[in-house]
From Swiss-Prot:
This is ATP synthase epsilon chain. GO terms for cellular component: plasma membrane; proton-transporting ATP synthase complex. One of its GO terms (molecular function) is proton-transporting ATP synthase activity, rotational mechanism. SUPFAM superfamilies: Epsilon subunit of F1F0-ATP synthase C-terminal domain, Epsilon subunit of F1F0-ATP synthase N-terminal domain. It comes from Hydrogenovibrio crunogenus (strain DSM 25203 / XCL-2) (Thiomicrospira crunogena). Disulfide bonds: none annotated. It is a peripheral membrane protein.
Amino acid sequence: MAVSMQVDIVSAEGSLFSGKADMVFAQAADGEVGILPKHTQLLTQLKPGQVRVVSGDEEDSFFINSGVLEVQPSVVTILADTAIRAEDLDQAAAEEAKRRAEDAMEQAKSDTDIARAQIELAEAVAQIQTITKLRDRLHKTGLS
């Protein structure tokens, strides 16, 4: 029997994913992490980006705007401020959010305004990257 782990992705809106997986990839503050079953315990902050949950030949993809990744030997929990299934992301809305954030950065008058615009820009860019990666994966597998 193959070794797997329980993966739970939870946001303020509720549980988005709960199931067994062979591997999880997430965008941690210091770079991408890959988690396998029986991984050493870990607690790390997540930055905006894609989370991939791999189980056999299946892969579920999500966008996380920020949150925390907790790893126990047989359980991975992601607590996210916002989590969206990658296929539910709206590219036009993400492009518009990116444009608005870039405009806000140009018009920012304080450090707080700049920081807020940088966060919004990072989230929009991460959404666009998640959409692009999902589209590329679907194209490679012939599902597009």
